[in-house]
From Swiss-Prot:
This is Breast carcinoma-amplified sequence 1 homolog. InterPro entries: NABC1 (IPR026115). It comes from Mus musculus. Residues 1-34, 57-422, 454-633 are annotated as: Disordered. Homodimer. Interacts with DYNLL1 and DYNLL2. Residues 614-633 are annotated as: Interacts with DYNLL1 AND DYNLL2. The gene is Bcas1. Residues 300-318, 400-410, 471-481, 537-555 have a biased composition (Basic and acidic residues). The keyword Cytoplasm applies. Highly expressed in the brain and, more specifically, in oligodendrocytes. Expressed in the Schwann cells (at protein level).
Length: 633
């Protein structure tokens, strides 16, 4: 495409006398054959016979730039040093090749050059005479993609290679140039079409546009690198004026073409740097904004999260429903950490806020229902009170145990939060001494219920904390309605011991045994100012129980039948200590000394209770059964 515009200038060149053209041919051939004008004189004579062909062939060399000729000359560059001698020997073959071109008609050249085979053969043969065209790209370096691949190869180092290829095989090489030249405009059309296509889709796909102008620049850079030696390598001093004129005119044509026809690649070429910079800036800005949106909402979330968690923690501390809300909070935190997009973060934040607002009224409703359920449980004294996890600040025995169970369950599920919660609950318990006193008075009941609640560790800690405290405050805070649940619990305990221990308790006997051993070791530690009445009876019953339990151990080791008989015998003596304790409780709420008595009587009862339960469950744990027996004896 770009060569058609430069062709009409050549008829003007035909007006020059043929002498100048022959000078051009001789100078070019001198460049090719390393200074052998003798062999070339015959050629020059032949060109004098038909001057038109020489002129046209020398002027059609602009169109010889095709990828195939580029490849041929590039192949020749590798062995271009020894081409001079070969050219000398094969001069007559070149003459025969020129006769082939002379027989072809010339007048089709101003038209389409891609389809004219005669023009193509002439161009390919006289390709060494492209010296005047070598100045064009050097003077006009900014050639577009369409004209770039064409004019690069016609440099002076490439002249001998083209000559060498045309000389040995005249017949087969003659038809090949039309294909090459047909490909050159086809590539130009492809470049133009692709450039237009990508120009239309430049907004959609900026990456291919950027990649294509890069290729264009890559093709132009080696051209300019090869053009630099091309300027001094043209020893055409004879026809310098005509060469300059032709090169200027052709350069103008090529420039007009480069801005008109292949102007498409130049527009993306100019925009090539801009879209990259803009894209990088946009990408960086978008990435930074994305990270900002990622970072800033998360920071606000992390700032808001502690508040929410504090509020929910306060609610859960007040309500006793620690485990469920903690799990929901931890899940919410984990989900919020996993969120990547700010929109999702906002939606999930709204969701979790709604959930928190829903949780707080439900917990308050649970509080009310627990308070409502609390009075009949207090009267009944059932062990189901462990399920009501929300006690008022002066709680009776079952609700304090329920709180302990809630702590125990919250601890293993969420360890770090559970530790924080544990400390808070322990502080609250230390503040409310009534609850602690209840826990101490409850110790027999809790030892019975340890299988269900599994709060042995906390009860032991509370008993440790409450032992050094003065008993006057506890006696003052004791109220008369607390007698009834203690009595009810003792009665239930006696009934349970008579009926036997259920399987769930049997599975958890080991925990309870550890608890009983610890409590037995700790309860006899305070001084023992025991009055003669109830405490001695309790100790007698406990010692008798211990002896029986030791006997039972030997019996169980011997045979299981004896164990069954002794289990049948035991319920009667185990009913006795609850009644004794009930009498002690009825008599002893008036003075602190009697409260101490009750505490030690409970300790003795614990001593008797541990081995009895172990024998009932038929689970022998030696340290629990043997240790307390030795101490009691």
């Amino acid at each position: 495409m770009g060569n058609q515009m430069s062709v009409p200038l050549r008829p003007g060149d035909q007006e020059h006398d043929p002498g100048a053209d022959t000078c051009k041919v001789t100078s070019d051939n001198e460049c090719v054959q390393n200074g052998n004008p003798v062999v070339l004189s015959t050629r020059v004579i032949q060109h004098y016979e038909e001057v038109d062909l020489g002129i046209s062939s020398s002027k059609d060399n602009v169109a010889t730039s095709s990828p195939k000729t580029m490849e041929a000359q590039a192949v020749g560059d590798a062995s271009g040093k020894n081409l001079g001698k070969e050219a000398k020997t094969k001069a007559p073959a070149a003459r025969s090749h020129f006769f082939l071109t002379l027989s072809r008609p010339v007048p089709g050249r101003p038209g389409d050059q891609g389809t004219d085979s005669s023009a193509a053969s002439g161009r390919f043969d006289v390709s060494p005479s492209a010296a005047p065209e070598n100045k064009d790209p050097s003077e006009h370096g900014a050639l577009p993609v369409a004209a770039a691949p064409g004019q690069a190869p016609d440099k002076t180092p490439g002249c001998p290679e083209a000559k060498q290829q045309t000389l040995p095989a005249t017949g087969p090489l003659a038809p090949s140039p039309p294909e090459s030249q047909a490909e050159a405009p086809a590539q130009d059309k492809d470049f133009g079409f692709l450039n237009r296509f990508f120009k239309l889709d430049k907004g959609r796909e900026s990456a291919p546009v950027n990649s294509q102008p890069k290729e264009a620049k890559g093709s132009e850079d080696p051209e300019q690198a090869t053009e630099a030696p091309a300027v001094p390598g043209n020893p055409h001093g004879v026809s310098a004026g005509e060469d300059i004129v032709d090169s200027e005119q052709r350069g103008q044509d090529v420039d007009t073409l480069s801005y008109s026809v292949p102007g498409d690649p130049e527009v993306p070429g100019t925009t090539k740097e801009d879209p990259q910079v803009v894209d990088t800036t946009e990408n960086s800005s978008s990435i930074m904004s994305f990270f900002k949106t990622l970072v800033s909402p998360n920071k606000t979330e992390t700032k808001k999260d502690p508040e929410d968690t504090k509020a929910t923690k306060a609610d859960s501390v007040c309500d006793g429903h620690a485990a469920g809300q903690k799990m929901s909070e931890t899940q919410a935190k984990s989900k919020k950490k996993r969120l990547d997009s700010p929109r999702l973060g906002l939606s999930f934040r709204k969701l979790f806020r709604h959930k928190d607002t829903e949780n707080s009224p439900t917990t308050s409703a649970n509080l009310k229902s627990d308070k409502a359920n609390f009075t009949p449980q207090e009267t009944r004294g059932k062990t189901k009170a462990t399920k009501s996890c929300s006690p008022p600040p002066p709680p009776p025995e079952p609700t304090s145990e329920g709180r302990d169970s809630g702590k125990e369950k919250a601890g293993p599920t969420s360890l770090p939060l559970g530790k924080l919660f544990w400390k808070k609950s322990v502080k609250e318990d230390t503040l409310s001494t009534g609850a602690e006193e209840n826990a101490v008075c409850e110790s027999p009941v809790e030892t019975v219920r340890l299988e269900e609640v599994e709060s042995s560790l906390q009860t032991v800690d509370l008993s440790e904390e409450t032992q050094p405290e003065p008993t006057d405050v506890k006696v003052k805070e004791e109220s008369k309605p607390r007698k009834t649940p203690l009595m009810a619990f003792l009665r239930q305990m006696s009934v349970r011991s008579s009926e036997g221990i259920p399987r769930s308790e049997e599975s958890n006997v080991k925990d309870s045994s550890c608890q009983t051993s610890n409590s037995v070791e700790k309860t006899p530690s305070p001084p023992e100012p025991e009055p003669a009445g109830t405490a001695q009876k309790n100790k007698e019953t406990s010692s008798s129980k211990d002896k029986k339990s030791v006997d039972k151990k030997s019996a169980t080791e011997n045979s299981k039948q004896k164990n069954g008989k002794q289990e049948v015998r035991e319920p009667a003596p185990c009913v006795q200590p609850p009644t004794v304790e009930a009498n002690a409780m009825q008599t002893g709420d008036k003075t602190p000394k009697k409260s101490e008595k009750r505490r030690q009587s409970l300790g003795g009862f614990l001593k008797g209770l541990g081995p009895k339960r172990m024998s009932d469950a038929q689970v022998q744990t030696d340290p629990v059964s043997i240790g307390p027996v030795g101490k009691s004896k």
